[in-house]
Structure formats: structure tokens, C-alpha cells
A protein has these predicted regions:
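Extracellular and organelle-lumenal recognition/adhesion modules and their flexible linkers in secreted
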Residues: 18-193
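Structured catalytic-domain cores with a bias toward divalent-metal coordination
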Residues: 103, 179-604
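Bacterial N-terminal signal peptides that target proteins for export
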Residues: 1-9
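Short alpha-helical segments used as structural interaction elements across diverse proteins
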Residues: 2-3, 110, 244, 418
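Hydrophobic h-region of N-terminal signal peptides that target proteins for export
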Residues: 11-19
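Short, surface-exposed beta-edge/turn micro-motifs
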Residues: 10, 60-61, 228, 579
Length: 604
């Protein structure tokens, strides 16, 4: 997906001169049948023709887009680049009728992107999680966002594979204003005692500035966390700048004053272990981090202090080591995994197994959303398993036994990744692949704690959705989403480590969240009876409540509305899902420049 996003950005920039004042010829009525459709752009390796037969409706026109020859780019783009016009500050439903030819590997995806001033990225979505593969005409749609500051809207169709795609009746339909004034919910009279309890019992956090090392305000955490050897730090979404800052400061405190020496990321094990070498170099810290940690974090400037801090510890008696527990490739050094194959001796891997793995890695890199066939899955998994087993057997006599064990685990994860790529989406509930990925991440984290970093205390950086436990008990308050069959990483870890793992979730009252590649509207006001409204009424900019220490029957041990999971207002006895919550009154985004609001930085 990162490759497609980057390429679409470059495509849009290259086509800036072609930008129109508004969407044009969405129903293909302009121009003659059999000709190129007016107003649309595509690469020279593709041919587009207007049709009036075989379309989605008897009286409609449509377009065929077809690859020419075999020398094709990673994907084709049939698109328009327009001024926002009346779409500005609107939620916009983007839809089209699409079908693809029945050719192996043939896929299509609707895509929509907004560009902001100074070449900043706005909203982006490309159906990478649900590509179009049906030969039947079907209507596809999603709701996009055009920010008030947007300078350009880019939209169209992506083609994957050497095939022919048909499309018709593209539509851009405003669904309502994107940004509305924030109106504080009115505190209910019956909730006043709860606010008073928070004022007296919540732990005030003086600052979230990661550069501020006066940790007097964090001292209560020593008693709360106690002997836990794993502390999991969640986040509501992957664009929560204030949460990131708070986590970075917590990491410094846990490392310097509580003996936590490992930082484990929701990123690839192979990538993050290799990243350690880059951190220990002259490369800029954030650039080095991008070799291992997903770009949703490392493309933002707010993360720089953390990686510079990690670098500063490497020559000390207690360096902060970094690792990952995800089975996915996450960094910019995927070619390094291919080089590992070249370096494996004949006694470890046959040429056939090397080639099978090599072909699969390249297919994943070349085709976003690549889904192996059953035969490809079985072949790649078998090859990865044989290589992993051979590496483990040879570890005892290897020149570098730990390196051999590291590579064995990496190939084991690769086999799991191949299976993950075969997963599909249900019509309702949680994504079917989430439990598989979460279970593997949980098993990996337990392995890190009990084996790879045995005797070390570990800090976990991940989404709150992954570190939660007892997810089935969460009332999403949505008909189309439930967690009843969702086995999370946090559940796996909790069942193995129990109270040796302490989990902190985060939430916010107001503000804005966005990662470096997307822009989101400001947060909507929380419910009047929500935990966030109670915290806000208590008047603390930052505060933490320890759920573990609450007595039975406490009001926080009852179902409450809170939004730690993607800012959706869900209901649960959150004390059964997390061990603590850290509240931020005002959220701010993780921008490429790493800007923060006035007053956040307290270190002089």
C-alpha cells in the first residue's frame, strides 16, 4: 500500500498541469464511442475506450481500460486531478460501477486522495483492503473527506495485473459538512460525584514533553506497575501526536527509572532487529527508524525525540534495544531479506526453496494486496518452514548462534505472513485476518519476553485495539461491527503473563488526529456521560487512572462510554480490557514537521 500511495502522489504531481476546474465526463457521455474518454488520464501502457454496449445499464455508457503489452508499471491509474470547488470541507461519497476480466491476478481499486498546501498529504484511500476481483458488474463506494484547506482532489481507478477493466457512472456526492464547531457536551448533574472522585484520585501528569526528564509526576507509576515485566502502551489511532509524546516520555521514565531495556514495536521482527544496526550509525535517527518501524509512525516528526533518545543510550551500560513482534514486513529494508536468502548456505536452503521465497517476497512488494493461491501459499510456507528448521538445527554449531536463531524466527514469521495474505473480509464483524495476526503477534511477544530477551523488561508500542483483552465484552454500539470472535494480542499475552503484563490505553476529549499521510476532521464531541467528558470536567490537561487498584463496585467498574478504539464511542467495563487509562484533554496530529501546540513543550 505504501508503494501505491507514493506512486499515486508522484502521478498526481506529474499531472498537475492537467488539473481541471472540476470533475468531468463521469458518465462518459462527452465524446464519441470508441474514442479515448475526455477529461481522464492514464499511462501510455494502457488504452481506454468509451463503450455503449455491455455496460452496467442498457442505456448507459462505460469505459474499458486495458493493459497493452507486458512491459507494465506496478499498477495502472485511470484518474482525474481537479480543484476541490464545492467539494471542499465535505464528506464525499465516491462510487462507480466496475467489473474485471477473469484473468489470474486481475484486480481493480477505486482510489481517492486530497492534496494540502506545501505538498502535504490529505485524505487517502484506495480499497487496498477490499480489491475488486469480480467479473460481474457491481457498484463500489466509500466516503472520502475533502479538508477545508485542500488544494486538489485526485480520484479514479487503479488496475493491477495485465488485464481489462470496465467502469461506469463515476459519482462524487457530497454527504455533509466535514468540520463543524465543537460544542462541549453538558455534564449531567448525577455525574458530579464522579468528577470529584477524578479530581481527588486521578494521577495528574504534569507534562507529556519527552524532553522533560523531571519525572516527579510519574513516580506513582512505580507502585502501580509494580513487578510487571511487560508494559503495553496503546493508542487510539495511528495519528495521535499527543499520545505519541506521552508514550515517548513514559518510555524514558520506564527505561531510566524502572529498568525496562527493550522497546517492542507493532512492526516486523526482522525489520526492527535490523533497524538496531541503522540506529547505531551516523544516519539521521528518524531515517534509521524507517528501516524497521511502520511509516505511520516514522514519517512524522514527533517521533524524532524517541529515536534520538534510543541512539543516545547505545553506548551506555543499559542501551534501549528495539525489536518488533509483527509478522509483516514494516520497514524500508525489504531487499535486505532477499539478501539473507543469497547468503544462506546449501546446507540450510535448497535453490528451489530460496527461489520460492524470493518470488513470494517480490510478489508482495510488487503487488499491493497480493493474495497467493492455495498452491503458492503451501509452497511458500513449506519452503519457509524447511529453512527455519534448518537454521534452528544449525544454531548450535553456527559461527553466530543468535543470528541463526534470529533468522529462523524471521522465516517462521514469513510463513505466517504468507497465510495472512490469503485472508478475506467478512461482511460484518471484525476482519477475519485480525485474529490470526493478533494471535501471532501475541505469541511473538511472549517469545520475546520469555526467550529472546529473557530477563529483560519490555515496553510495547501498539494500537490499543491490539493490546486490549476481553474484546468480546466490548459493546461497539454498531450493527456492522462486533468483536465477539476477535482474539487479540492482548488476550494472548494476558493468558500467558497475567499480571506480569500491565496495559495502558489512551483517550482524548477534543482536538485533531492525523498521521503524516492523511488528514482527518477534528474529533467530534464525546457523549455527555462518557469518561472523556468526566475527565475534561475534572480540569486536568493530562491524567492517569489505575484500573487495577479500583475496589469492587466502583463506578469505573461498570459499563461506561469511552473511545480508546479509533475514537468510536463504545461501551464496556473498561477495567476488564485495560489496566489503566491516560487522558489527554487536547489531541494534536503527528505531522511531518513535528509541530506541537503552544504550551506542550515544557523543557527549557
Amino acid at each position: 500500500m505504501k508503494i501505491v500511495r507514493r506512486a499515486l502522489l508522484m502521478s498526481a504531481m506529474a499531472a498537475a498541469a492537467l488539473a481541471q476546474t472540476g470533475p468531468r465526463n463521469l458518465d462518459f457521455r462527452e465524446g464519441a464511442v470508441g474514442e479515448e474518454p475526455a477529461g481522464w488520464n492514464h499511462q501510455p501502457q494502457y488504452e481506454a475506450r468509451v463503450l455503449d454496449t455491455g455496460c452496467h445499464k442498457p442505456d448507459a455508457r462505460c469505459v474499458s481500460i486495458e493493459a497493452k503489452g507486458n512491459d507494465l508499471p506496478p499498477f495502472g491509474s485511470f484518474s482525474q486531478f481537479v480543484a476541490p470547488g464545492d467539494l471542499r470541507n465535505q464528506r464525499v461519497k465516491f462510487s462507480a460501477w466496475v467489473r474485471v476480466t477473469e484473468v489470474p491476478g486481475c484486480k481493480a481499486q477505486l482510489w481517492f486522495r486530497t492534496d494540502l498546501p506545501d505538498n502535504a498529504a490529505g485524505f487517502f484511500y484506495n480499497m487496498n483492503d477490499r480489491p475488486i476481483t469480480s467479473p460481474e458488474w457491481k457498484l463500489y463506494e466509500f466516503v472520502a473527506q475533502v479538508q477545508p484547506e485542500a488544494v486538489k482532489v485526485n480520484f479514479g481507478l487503479i488496475l493491477l495485473g495485465a488485464c481489462k477493466v470496465y467502469a461506469g457512472d463515476f459519482k462524487l456526492e457530497p454527504q455533509g459538512i466535514l468540520e463543524t464547531p465543537f460544542v462541549d457536551p453538558k455534564l449531567r448533574t448525577e455525574d458530579a460525584p464522579k468528577v470529584e472522585w477524578l479530581k481527588k484520585n486521578a494521577i495528574p501528569i504534569r507534562t507529556i514533553d519527552p524532553a522533560d526528564d523531571d519525572f516527579a509526576d510519574l513516580q506513582p507509576l512505580k507502585k502501580i506497575i509494580g513487578d510487571a515485566r511487560v508494559v503495553q502502551l496503546g493508542e487510539q489511532s495511528h495519528g495521535d501526536g499527543a499520545t505519541f509524546y506521552a508514550k515517548e516520555r513514559l518510555i524514558r521514565f520506564l527505561h531510566e527509572q524502572m529498568g525496562f531495556d527493550v522497546l517492542a514495536w507493532e512492526s516486523g521482527f526482522y525489520d526492527c532487529e535490523e533497524m538496531n544496526q541503522a540506529i547505531d550509525s551516523d544516519m539521521p535517527a528518524l531515517e534509521a527508524a524507517q528501516k524497521g518501524v511502520f511509516g505511520i509512525w516514522t514519517r512524522g516528526g514527533l517521533m524524532t525525540p524517541l529515536f534520538e533518545y534510543a541512539r543516545s543510550t547505545l553506548k551506555t551500560a543499559r542501551p534501549l534495544r528495539q525489536t518488533g513482534f509483527d509478522i509483516q514486513f514494516s520497514g524500508s529494508n525489504q531487499q535486505g531479506f532477499l539478501k539473507v536468502l543469497d547468503d544462506l548456505g546449501d546446507g540450510i536452503a535448497s535453490d528451489a526453496d530460496k527461489q520460492t521465497v524470493r518470488d513470494t517476497v517480490r510478489a508482495m512488494a510488487r503487488t499491493p494486496g497480493y493474495k497467493p493461491s492455495k498452491e503458492e501459499e503451501m509452497a511458500a510456507q513449506a519452503a519457509a518452514t524447511r529453512i527455519a528448521e534448518a537454521l534452528r538445527k544449525s544454531a548450535g554449531s553456527a559461527r553466530d548462534p543468535r543470528r541463526a536463531q534470529f533468522l529462523a524466527k524471521s522465516f517462521e514469521d514469513f510463513g505466517a505472513l504468507v497465510h495472512l495474505r490469503t485472508q478475506t473480509l467478512p461482511s460484518q464483524g471484525i476482519r477475519a485476518d485480525f485474529s490470526f495476526r493478533d494471535i501471532k503477534m501475541g505469541e511473538n511477544l511472549i517469545w520475546l519476553a520469555n526467550d529472546w530477551y529473557k530477563g529483560k523488561k519490555i515496553i510495547v508500542w501498539a494500537a490499543s485495539m491490539h493490546v486490549t483483552r476481553n474484546a468480546a465484552a466490548i459493546d461497539t454500539r454498531m450493527d456492522t461491527l462486533n468483536y465477539k470472535d476477535y482474539r487479540t494480542m492482548g488476550q494472548v499475552v494476558h493468558e500467558s503473563l497475567g499480571k506480569a503484563a500491565y496495559t495502558i490505553t489512551f483517550t482524548a476529549y477534543r482536538g485533531k488526529s492525523a498521521n503524516p499521510s492523511t488528514s482527518q476532521p477534528p474529533l467530534m464531541p464525546p457523549a455527555a456521560e462518557s469518561v472523556e467528558t468526566l475527565f475534561h470536567a475534572a480540569g486536568m490537561p493530562y491524567a492517569l487512572v489505575d484500573f487495577r487498584g479500583l475496589p469492587e463496585g466502583h463506578w469505573l467498574r461498570t459499563p461506561m462510554i469511552m473511545r480508546p478504539l479509533g475514537y468510536a464511542q463504545m461501551k464496556s467495563d473498561w477495567t476488564t480490557n485495560f489496566d489503566a487509562v491516560l487522558f489527554t484533554d487536547v489531541m494534536f496530529p503527528n505531522t511531518p514537521a513535528g509541530t506541537v501546540p503552544a504550551g506542550v513543550k515544557t523543557k527549557k
